[in-house]
Amino acid sequence: MIYRWGDDGELEVMLGHMGGPYWSRKDKAAWSIPKGQREEGEVSLDTARREFEEEIGQPPPDGEEVALGDVRQSGGRKVVEAWAIEGDMDVTKIESTPFEMEWPPRSGKLREFPEFDRARWFEIEAARPRIVKAQAAFLDRLVELVGPAPSG
């Protein structure tokens, strides 16, 4: 999770809007941190960095990673572990890795869609209704660790 301090001093996080036809008209609980499956022999922080670059099309900013722990996604099978890094980036220039799915359903036609179709900066309270429900805990943990406003 990339965070920054906005012009008004508010804590902001970068989230990606999930791609594909199911999510195209959704906003509530349709945004996520970049995430993905760990490859064999890979440590979770390396997975987070690799997935960020695959889903955003840019490497994460350099900086000290702050562990945010893990959450269990709805359905209970997928555990997501996250870190936060302070940084800034142009979210208008993302190039997300595509995935394939049959669309329309039962058509037999495979189509490609981006994992994220766009990214955006959100203040924490604006992010809450938009982020995938289980990942909202990461917002709370980030505020606990870095505070709601910059120190100094």
What are these regions (language model features)?
Residues 30-34, 40, 85, 147:
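Functional cleft and adjacent loop/helix regions within the main domain
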Residues 7-9, 20-23, 39-40, 76, ...:
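Short, charged/polar surface micro-motifs in flexible loops or helix N-caps
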Residues 70-108, 120, 142:
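Active-site-adjacent beta-strand/loop module that shapes the phosphate/pyrophosphate-binding cleft
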Residues 1-33, 83:
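N-terminal strand-loop-strand
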Residues 111-117:
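Non-DNA-binding regulatory cores of transcription-related proteins
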Residues 120, 124-152:
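Charged phosphate-binding loop/patch that engages nucleotide di/tri-phosphates or the phosphate backbone
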Residues 33-68, 123:
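The catalytic Nudix box helix
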Residues 37, 71-72, 131:
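Structured beta->alpha junctions
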